[in-house]
């Protein structure tokens, strides 16, 4: 695992996570320009399922904008998008990300997994590894995961990893399955 580099963001020094993170059942690799089409294809193949919980899940233009902007977001230290693959040259089977939108000392993890790979603990394993990587960055004191109260499968991931439910906030519903109650899970 190669350490990321340091940069200034909003007048403070921040560290980028590594471009590649290998673990027992997969590898998380930074989404670069060359990866965008494969990532979009994997997300599109899961659009029907993702649209229940992710606003860009069923909107091809929004999906292209969000995923297509990932390389720039990484360079500007706004967010770090990873493709999950079973091997370095394997197909994209999920998306995992770190976002700098929860305050200067925290990162938020987001994730989705291809339907054929759910139910076997792979998301939990990948999020666990990504949590450790995030907490190893010198400026990061906490990691958050935000899940809709109705998305029990997604909420099971932070629960299994020992995150604590810090609060439940109201939010504007953007998809058909959302409840408008956002669970904020925080590392202990």
Predicted regions: what they are:
Residues 40-43, 67-71:
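A generic alpha-helix structural signal
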Residues 48-69:
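Conserved GNAT-fold acetyl-CoA-binding loop/helix
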